[in-house]
Amino acid sequence: MKTILQILPSLHKINGGVERGTLDIARELAERKYNSVIISSGGEMADRYKYKGVSHHKIEINKKGLVNFFASRGKFKKLLDQIKPDLVHVRSRWPSFCFTSEIKKRKIPYVTTYHGTYSGNQNLLKKSYNKVMTNGDKIISISKFIDDHIRHFFPEVKNKLV
């Protein structure tokens, strides 16, 4: 059975698009007999589909900072050893920033979803942080508007957009 791992900061926002999309995909994957796994810092939606075959692992990735960066990376490496995903889907900048190098080091196919027009692309440091969402083997843009935004600020990744 193939294992698909989705990663996002939290499952707190009941009406959040990232959260809702993650859970909808997780449920669909489980229904299609994939091993569907989510990593987040938890939240009221974390156990929503547990009974439908979706598993959730908690790592505190909703708080930015150097201490949390190293703590979450250590836990993530252990979970990767345990889960052995066939595909990783990262849905937010901070988890992408923290985990991309480990995903790529293990040569796990890697997808990101670019959910918004992250501000600050005029600032070199902020643009570098925003660019972590283009590190996937493929980049899912949630709309034509977001697709155009990515092409404008990161034209070198246009062939990775789906």
Regions inferred by a protein language model and the residue ranges of each:
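N-terminal strand-loop element at the rim of the active site
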Residues: 7-15, 21-68
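Short His-centered aromatic/hydrophobic patch
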Residues: 90-96, 114
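A short, active-site helix/loop in glycosyltransferases that binds the activated sugar's phosphate group
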Residues: 136-161
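Alpha-helix capping/helix-boundary segments
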Residues: 44-45, 94-95, 145-147
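A conserved, positively charged/aromatic
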Residues: 111-140, 155
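An amphipathic, basic-hydrophobic alpha-helix
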Residues: 52, 62-88, 97-101, 105-106, ...
